[in-house]
């Protein structure tokens, strides 16, 4: 094995030799000192500088950090060859810094010590090939791998379940058709042909710290004849509402199926886990090529699922195992959007959990971010933003304008891209901004100040219109002062309603009595006398009583 791994040997640069008095002048220190660590095998190699001296042996010491004294290196004392195996060294930890030194010896003479640069065994160790055991099926090969190192390995004691195995497989008849894949310590290679010879090799590696091992020797095996009852193929599992639906393909009829599941982490443990498979509820002895089971069968994590067909006493081989990640199957429902206007022409958006998420919010199970599409209602220009918050505000918007928003949930994980559909679009109108409010206040104040002036102007215009088109029936005061003080209401009376005054004529040659009656009829004066009153003697008079009294007084005077 060491010959196989010679290419991976580590070269440790030697330091300056630690010079001690030598017994012979021709005995020199070893050269080209090399330390090779593969798994738990520690090999020290060197080149002799005293080939001309016979009976030369070599001895080495080691020292660990914290030790004051040098200790003889086991397996490397009085060695006649140019290498030694010190795998039996009792190291407290493979993570401690270690020092080595070596010298040549012959008789009582010794060369100066040649001290090797200090090193940490784990950092310098190389990963050896795993042990490989193969079993054949008709269309598959079962692989059983043992991790590198010994059973009680000190070097890989903390990493035995962390190894990642890389396999290269090809048909023996054609090495050009190589296929490389990552496998577990207990795994199965599918999609092979029956009765065919396949060859493969495997190497192990660590991801942290990153270490890559060497390939194992090549192993070859023949697949068996085709099984009379084929295995189910093309397994597929999907989440629908609160259940999982497992489907597969099968060409034969009148068969029943059963499905089992296994925790994926068990695959990393290098041991037989065939008894760890468990039956899936509602997926036993089913006659259809699908089965439905509740989601609570699986907790959050990664699992493997396999299906087997049965026909009476005959059973098929297990199908190819389907890797199933519950996180990948989780259904993301669209979020619930709430938007309301706030001051200064801004809109506040709130994102809530959907009703379909039952009693647990989706973001309690997975870290979510939200893709938010925001736009003005009358515009096709959209603003696309990503938000981790469930409450945020869009500011500096146009006052009294309708804006619309919709959003979808995304799983915040670089390993996959999962998202929900977009939510329903929600639209809301912004409030007036501070500028609009200032203009509104200014407008109100201006209206209050201009109202008296407008009112006065309207009043003046109204008076002018009334004066021109609707003049007053009463004469102006300058004209009215020439009329009698008696009212003119009688002028408006009809003829039948006019008051009359009866005049009496008394003939007296010596005395002429003139009765003068003044009436205000159409602003003219009427007179009545004894000389001219030979007509009917009927006159209109406003005050009949006063006229009668005056007439009676005149008659009495005449009689006297």
UniProtKB/Swiss-Prot annotation:
Record carries keyword Phosphoprotein: yes
Protein's cellular compartments: Cell membrane; Late endosome; Lysosome
Residues where Phosphoserine is found: 496, 536
Positions of modified residues (Phosphotyrosine): 467, 482
Boundaries of every Fibronectin type-III domain copy: 29-125, 133-224, 231-329, 333-433
Annotated segments matching region Important for interaction with TYK2: 492-501
Quaternary state and interactors: Heterodimer with IFNAR2; forming the receptor for type I interferon. Interacts with TYK2. Interacts with STAT1 and STAT2; the interaction requires its phosphorylation at Tyr-482. Interacts (serine-phosphorylated form) with FBXW11, the substrate recognition component of a SCF (SKP1-CUL1-F-box protein) E3 ubiquitin-protein ligase complex. Interacts with SHMT2; this promotes interaction with ABRAXAS2 and the BRISC complex. Interacts with TRIM10; this interaction prevents association between IFNAR1 and TYK2.
Protein name: Interferon alpha/beta receptor 1
Source organism of this protein record: Sus scrofa (Pig)
